[in-house]
Regions:
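Glycine-rich beta-strand-to-loop/alpha-helix junction loops that act as flexible
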Residues: 10-12, 67-75, 153, 226-227, ...
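Short alpha-helical segments enriched in small residues
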Residues: 119, 232-419
Length: 419
């Protein structure tokens, strides 16, 4: 089994800033969890000569080369051609791939496959084909001398599917061991704080990994183990997971979830509770994140984006004299918004957000980053006062995180940190 890897992303759009390379981060986590050390990330534009040169350099410093992008049917999709030229491997037509693509076009597009798509069925001779049920471009893995090359689509959801369902099982088969992993989610602590609490548990070993990485507003831990089978892997991870939960306490909010919003929806669904939201500075972000999850309609009744005082008054019935006395960005208005949307929708629970995401503060001396998050429940209304740093996007993202965290804490009988 390859022990070292280089990830090579192909696409001019990745270099001109038009597209963010999310595939590299995901693949690095997957390979690391599988026991493959990622040594380099390389990005190459849509130029065959430069890609061939990159392959020549990479094969001298890593055993596994993982390529993303450039597998489609257009003129600039030349990854297979350049990689096979550099590794002296011919391309051959794979008839089973042709049939897969024809069925996909008939099912999804209700038409015949265009002739130009036929080039996607040409793959390296002797390769293991990675079929693609979520797109048209197949991937593959093959070995040339001491180099193993894996070719994956560049479209993120296709790349992720193929990496998880094709590349990872292939690595396990080659190694003769099973790899299993869990992503643990933490909110309310910084990465250094997590490391301080878990210091002796963090490790990168041959058969066990527990490593932190941060995203805006939260910290995640990648826990993975290798063993003879899935049961053995889970048995190795169980005591570590239990210790992480014990040390982090209320800051640990879930494993293998998409985010705080999924945790909140699950908790509400289990308790038969409904939810609503009133948003000002987040501009509908809370509602979006909830409705991104299938089945959210069982819990989320609706939301109001009350960006102006007029809408706060007319729709949420926030008193005009309250706005005049306290200002739109205040604990009092956050309370009124949360209660107003709960009454309006008839929801069991409601959250509200009002704040200053920038670029300027308000005329009452509140600086950018001042945010109030309200939670209205049958027992009453609580408010969390935040002072957040960063740009407009970060402030909005963190504000939504805190709204979900207040809900999570309420639903699990933890202090909501209201004031």
């Amino acid at each position: 089994m390859p022990r070292t890897a280089e990830i090579i992303a192909v696409g001019s759009e990745l270099l001109d800033g038009g597209v963010t390379n999310t595939n590299a981060a995901f693949l690095s986590r997957l390979l690391t969890a599988a026991g493959v050390e990622v040594l380099y990330h390389t990005t190459v534009d849509d130029d065959a000569a430069r890609l061939e040169k990159a392959v020549t350099i990479a094969r001298g410093r890593a055993e596994l080369l993982v390529f993303t992008g450039g597998l489609g049917p257009t003129y600039d999709d030349m990854t297979k051609t350049a990689v096979c030229a550099a590794l002296d491997t011919p391309l051959v037509l794979h008839q089973e791939v042709v049939e897969d693509m024809r069925r996909y076009f008939e099912k999804v597009f209700r038409r015949e496959m265009p002739e130009c798509d036929m080039q996607q069925a040409y793959l390296p001779e002797g390769c293991t084909v990675f079929r693609n049920p979520v797109g048209t471009a197949p991937g593959c893995v093959f070995t040339a001398g001491k180099t193993t090359a894996a070719l994956l689509p560049g479209v993120p959801h296709e790349c992720r599917y193929m990496a998880e369902h094709c590349l990872l099982p292939w690595l396990e088969q080659v190694r003769g061991q099973t790899v299993r992993s869990h992503t643990l989610h933490i909110f309310g602590l910084t990465e250094p704080q997590v490391q301080e609490l878990l210091g002796d548990l963090l490790r990168r070993e041959a058969d066990m990994t527990l490593a932190p990485y941060a995203k805006p507003g939260e910290v995640m831990l990648q826990l993975s183990a290798r063993g003879a089978d899935e049961r053995a892997c889970e048995a190795r991870m169980a005591p570590v997971l239990a210790e992480v939960r014990a040390r982090l306490g209320a800051y640990f909010y879930g494993a293998d979830v998409s985010g705080l919003e999924e945790t909140v929806l699950t908790l509400c669904r289990e308790r038969g509770l409904t939810l609503a939201a009133a948003e000002s500075c987040t501009g509908g972000l809370i509602a979006k994140r909830l409705t991104d999850i299938p089945g959210a309609s069982q819990v989320f009744l609706g939301g109001v984006v009350s960006y102006t005082n007029h809408v706060k008054q007319q729709v949420l019935h926030v008193p005009e004299n309250l706005l005049a006395r306290c200002g739109a960005v205040s604990a009092e208005v956050a309370r009124a918004m949360a209660l107003g949307v709960r009454v309006l929708t008839g929801a069991d629970l409601a959250v509200s957000v009002t704040g200053l995401a920038g670029p300027d503060g308000d005329d009452r001396g509140n600086p950018v980053g001042t945010v109030f998050v309200g939670l209205s429940a049958p027992e009453g209304v609580t408010v969390r006062h935040l002072t957040l740093g960063g740009d407009r996007e970060r402030i909005r993202t963190l504000s939504a995180h805190h709204a979900f965290d207040m809900l999570r804490r309420y639903l699990t009988n933890l202090p909501t940190e209201g004031e």
